[in-house]
């Protein structure tokens, strides 16, 4: 649903409501919207191109497609790989990495494009606690850089720690929205099957 909403000309079917980017409905944008929004898939394996032999080349792939000069590509890729702590993996094959490493490569491949908006779909669903921590360190860095981040996540502890605004969906419908403190202290949501943080339950 998130992807369909941001690509209305690609996915067919009935779509209700609207999404505005810079005050303009996304349906009125052309291909230039692709330069403003970065999408990180739930499964990093589906994001890896499969045509590049090294992590460095994989991270550079999007910039090559946008026609960025080689010197700038090298500079931006080196910087983002250092930021995401994958510089030591530069010469490794992306398809031979661990799940956590591959997810960081997928993130770096999007971040190097410098999008204004990041859509991240359950980035830790297949990761162990260490991999989860490393990925959310990167998300926090992007948040500190004032990037707009739309995070699809089911783990309530991560939502409690990193979110500012929370939207709760059930059966494809929005059932609650508001600031984090308001949503995570709403006991009525438990009747909808939403698991609230233990501290919120104890304090009720």
Model-predicted regions and their roles:
Residues 153-154:
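H-loop/switch region of ABC-family ATPase nucleotide-binding domains
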Residues 118-121:
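Catalytic Walker B motif of ABC-type/P-loop ATPase nucleotide-binding domains
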Residues 18-32:
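ABC ATPase NBD Q-loop/coupling interface
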Residues 173-196:
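Conserved beta-strand-loop-alpha-helix hinge in the C-terminal portion
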Residues 71-89:
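Conserved ABC ATPase "signature" region
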Residues 93-97, 101:
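Conserved ABC ATPase signature
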Residues 114:
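Conserved catalytic motifs of ABC-family nucleotide-binding domains
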